[in-house]
């Protein structure tokens, strides 16, 4: 009987371990400092939650702890696009970018204005703009048919135009083909191949704008330095 109780106790212990979700196991690995194991589970979880900013955030944390600042910045940036108001995501993205000599807030832009510009996610702003459009259409119909509500219709029209302008600028930022240097150093060459001379070297964590591609090379612009050239695809991570 005693042996039966011991066996049941052991089985219950194994059951509790296997009952943990991959996310819980990832968190446990992370707390234990097993960042590579945690990363594998977070990336597995990403397959079923591809638009979860906190999964990207946790992946970024793992890469940050492993010293891969470029890949950390790429994943923090993906999280930032989905949840721009989250303070932890914003702070960690700024920290990862600063390690590579970059800044989240462009030079000359007040931080308050930058936060206001990203106070809504792209999908939230798109939804707000669509709602304002339909409200304006409804009020405009009422004004045309009954000649009532002209003032509020004009007010909504102004708010809609402001929202539409904001959305247009966010759309340009959202669709900008960004990448980050993931390798310790990326060589910027004058053409798409190792036979072309290197004009500059860029450390990991620097932000790039992808302009074109040919074979295994991307034509890029280093945003903070204005340098243009070709870089090996394996040296960067697209965001």
Task: Describe the function of each predicted region.
Residues 102-145:
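Membrane-embedded alpha-helical segments of integral membrane proteins
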Residues 69, 143-200, 209, 221-239:
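Boundary regions of SH3-family modules and the immediately adjacent low-complexity/disordered segments
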């Amino acid at each position: 009987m005693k042996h039966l109780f011991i066996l049941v106790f052991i089985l219950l212990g194994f059951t509790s371990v296997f009952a943990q979700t991959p996310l819980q196991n990832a968190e446990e690995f992370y707390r234990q400092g097993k960042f590579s194991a945690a990363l594998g589970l977070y990336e597995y979880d990403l397959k079923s939650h591809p638009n979860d900013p906190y999964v990207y955030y946790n992946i970024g944390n793992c890469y940050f702890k492993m010293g891969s600042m470029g890949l950390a910045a790429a994943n923090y940036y993906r999280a930032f696009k989905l949840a721009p108001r989250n303070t932890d995501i914003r702070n960690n993205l700024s920290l990862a970018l600063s390690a590579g000599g970059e800044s989240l807030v462009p030079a000359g832009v007040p931080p308050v204005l930058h936060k206001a510009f990203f106070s809504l996610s792209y999908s939230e702003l798109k939804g707000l703009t669509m709602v304002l459009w339909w409200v304006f259409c409804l009020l405009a119909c009422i004004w045309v048919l009954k000649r009532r509500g002209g003032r509020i219709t004009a007010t909504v029209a102004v708010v809609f135009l402001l929202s539409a302008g904001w959305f247009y600028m966010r759309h340009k930022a959202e669709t900008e083909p960004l990448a980050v240097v993931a390798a310790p150093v990326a060589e910027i060459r004058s053409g798409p191949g190792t036979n072309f001379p290197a004009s500059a070297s860029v450390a990991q964590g620097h932000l790039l704008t992808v302009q074109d591609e040919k074979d295994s090379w991307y034509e890029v612009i280093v945003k903070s330095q204005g340098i243009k050239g070709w870089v090996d695809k394996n040296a960067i991570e697209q965001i």
